[in-house]
Amino acid sequence: MAYFSTATSLLLLVLSVSSPYVHGASDCDTLVITLFPCLPFISIGGTADTPTASCCSSLKNILDTKPICLCEGLKKAPLGIKLNVTKSATLPVACKLNAPPVSACDSLPPASPPTANGQAPVWGSGWAPAPSPSKGNSLIPISGFSFVIVTALAMFRI
């Protein structure tokens, strides 16, 4: 038991040190981890019809703190957990929150540390409710985000 937790922690450390995202997106990784309570609602095979209060609270915190991190969470990929992107896009509406549309993620630079003049990149002023789900099923694997989720689940035995 302790061996598994130690091995998982060591693996996480090694992968995070070698990750190209470590320096620019570590703040986002920390924020995205708080969305674990949303997995039953946004993951493929998730059984929740509505997000929990804890999920909505975490989403609100990210939107208030660094909304670009939601894009980072969707852009990162490989390890296991797959998100239903269509359902993920409805999360802000389900939580009764305003958020930039998912389509805005493509036009944004990756999250990064403050620029040379000391200012962080700005998200933009295009705030609007997330779009309603369309017919069909948009599914993509989400990896970096997935790795963090899988590791946390293993460590906390959720």
Curated annotation (Swiss-Prot):
The keyword Cell membrane applies. Keywords: Cell membrane, Disulfide bond, Glycoprotein, GPI-anchor, Lipoprotein, Membrane, Secreted, Signal. Confined to the ovaries of the inflorescence. Gene3D superfamilies: Plant lipid-transfer and hydrophobic proteins. Residues 135-158 form a propeptide. Glycans are attached at N84. Disulfide bonds join C28-C71, C38-C55, C56-C95, C69-C105. It holds the Pfam family LTP_2. GO terms for biological process: lipid transport. SMART domains: AAI. GO terms for cellular component: extracellular region; plasma membrane; side of membrane. InterPro entries: Bifun_inhib/LTP/seed_sf, Bifunc_inhib/LTP/seed_store, LTSS, Plant_nsLTP. GO terms for molecular function: lipid binding. A lipid is attached at S134 (GPI-anchor amidated serine). Residues 1-24 form the signal peptide. Belongs to the plant LTP family. Probable lipid transfer protein. PANTHER family: BIFUNCTIONAL INHIBITOR/LIPID-TRANSFER PROTEIN/SEED STORAGE 2S ALBUMIN SUPERFAMILY PROTEIN-RELATED (PTHR33044). This is Non-specific lipid transfer protein GPI-anchored 29.
